[in-house]
From Swiss-Prot:
GO cellular component terms listed in the entry, alphabetical order: cytoplasm
Positions of 4-amino-2-methyl-5-(diphosphooxymethyl)pyrimidine binding: Q50, F51, R52, Q53, K54, D82, T121, K150
Enzyme Commission designation: 2.5.1.3
InterPro entries for the chain: Aldolase_TIM (IPR013785), ThiamineP_synth_sf (IPR036206), ThiamineP_synth_TenI (IPR022998), TMP_synthase (IPR034291)
Binding sites annotated in the UniProt record for Mg(2+): D83, D102
Lineage: Bacteria, Pseudomonadati, Rhodothermota, Rhodothermia, Rhodothermales
Name of the protein described by the UniProt record: Thiamine-phosphate synthase
Length: 227
């Protein structure tokens, strides 16, 4: 018999969502490949890798994503593909992350089925709620702080805006945008499940150490909360 939620709809299976998402990018820096960034981030404690490549042809994206998929599979670390359902399927990734202007979440769920992780992007609480209703497993919310990784970032939301988004949905919210080691505590205390980082790791002199500092900051806050 199919499990149902309180509103009579099929119950959504809870999935394990990581707390430290590292996005790999070859646009902000060209010193390290996606695969190398993924390897270093995982060694530093990242529990989710998100392949993000906004530029270039589909064949090049697929080639790079396959290399990252190998790294993640060897380390038993979940891999999410930014934007591209086709690449996610071709690489047997664990899921996708979809922006506001990407493939609709409900359509993606129909294509991918119930098992893969689908993350949705939101910059307002009502957008987070809409993504949840469409079938998202987690919300990437931001920018929480000023960020240089996007040319025209939407208005900064701050910890208070993040808290509103966390209250709007019953699924994990991942804070993104200008996240630094020193800001981890404020976003977790606002209700975020975890953080997603890009330039703070990808452009760091030592991505592994940068990731490890994020891991330590997250774990430290969680330990305090449990004590």
């Amino acid at each position: 018999m199919e499990n149902t939620s309180t509103n009579g709809e099929p119950a959504r299976a809870e999935k394990s969502i990581g707390r430290l998402h590292v996005l790999t990018d070859f646009h902000l820096q060209q010193d390290r490949s996606h695969a190398e960034l993924a390897r270093l981030a995982i060694r530093g404690g990242a529990d989710t890798i998100q392949f993000r490549q906004k530029h270039g042809g589909i064949q090049n994206k697929l080639l790079e994503a396959r290399k990252v998929a190998t790294v993640c599979a060897d380390a038993s670390t979940p891999l999410l593909i930014d934007d591209h359902l086709d690449i996610a399927q071709a690489t047997d990734a664990d899921g996708v992350h979809l922006g506001q202007d990407d493939f609709p979440i409900d359509a993606a769920r129909s294509v991918l089925g119930p098992s893969p992780i689908i993350g949705g992007t939101a910059s307002k609480p009502h957008e987070a709620a809409e993504a949840y209703e469409q079938g998202a497993d987690y919300i990437g919310f931001g920018p929480v702080f000023p960020t240089t990784s996007k040319r025209n970032p939407k208005s900064v939301k701050g910890p208070d805006g993040l808290a509103d988004a966390c209250e709007a949905v019953p699924i994990p919210v991942i804070a993104i945008g200008g996240i630094t080691h020193d800001r981890v505590r404020s976003v977790l205390e606002a209700g975020a499940h975890g953080v997603a980082v890009l330039s703070a790791v990808d452009t760091a002199r030592n991505p592994e150490q940068a990731t490890a500092r994020f891991r330590a900051a997250i774990d430290g806050v969680l330990r305090e909360a449990d004590s």
